[in-house]
Amino acid sequence: MLTSSGYIQHHLTNAQMCTVDGSIAFNYACADAGFWTWHIDSLLFSVGLGVLFLFVFYKVGQKATTGVPGKLQCAVEMLMEFVSNAVKDSFHGRSPVIAPLALTIFVWILLMNTMDLIPVDFIPEAAKQILGVPYLKVVPTTDMNITFGLSLSVFALIVFYSIKIKGITGFVKELTLQPFNHWAFIPVNFILETIALIAKPISLSLRLFGNLYAGELIFILIALMPWWSQAALSVPWAIFHILVIVLQAFIFMMLTIVYLSMAHEDH
């Protein structure tokens, strides 16, 4: 019989794929695979939601009209205007990439976070009964690999635009001559600025992961309670969690815009 701790552990375990002795293995066989383990559920759901985002926006763009728009077109236009205003208010450089990037980050993370509102046993149990999959996590942002992948992409853009706008020399000066503008403090400046630079992707990823992981864990704990108390607890928490879902996507987007704006500042 599955215990409470076993139930929690089961729902927090990813569907894994790895290579063992030259052949592909899954789940239990990947216990000792270490770094070279693929979380295939996180990959499938994140890519699938990304494709859904592209498909919906593409279809809306194709059917866009200057007349009376439909409900979906109104929603997409409001979302695009919201992101566009956020970029105009926070980004002070010139780049046609930032607004589409911010829109992609916000909508993609929002879709991945929204998966947390699906009942915790619904999709995993269906996958187990139909496909025989023993483990399945449906919320990609509760997987640190996904959140770190997103934040490392942002980090790469920060470094790229810093070098592009300021040049190699300007980027090195930024790391070595701030905050103390004296050659004697170059080692101290380099350590402080390097830590500050590396802290950006780490804080981005851990903030998103921590909030969604905690939310998922609370849903799992509620599912362990007697049936008569589940509705009384799950509905209020789901309503509150909607705020968390939207807020975390917004924070990730805004910090990305701010960091890239800082990278475009030419001192």
From Swiss-Prot:
Annotated membrane topology is:
Multi-pass membrane protein
Pfam families linked to this entry:
ATP-synt_A
- Which CDD domains has this protein been placed in? ATP-synt_Fo_a_6
Predominant place of localization? membrane
This protein's UniProt keywords? ATP synthesis, Cell inner membrane, Cell membrane, CF(0), Hydrogen ion transport, Ion transport, Membrane, Transmembrane, Transmembrane helix, Transport
Does the keyword Ion transport feature in the UniProt annotation?
Answer: yes
Q: Which domain of life is it from?
A: Bacteria
Q: Which NCBIfam families match?
A: ATP_synt_6_or_A, PRK05815.1-1
Name the UniProt record assigns to this protein: ATP synthase subunit a
Q: Which organism is it from?
A: Psychromonas ingrahamii (strain DSM 17664 / CCUG 51855 / 37)
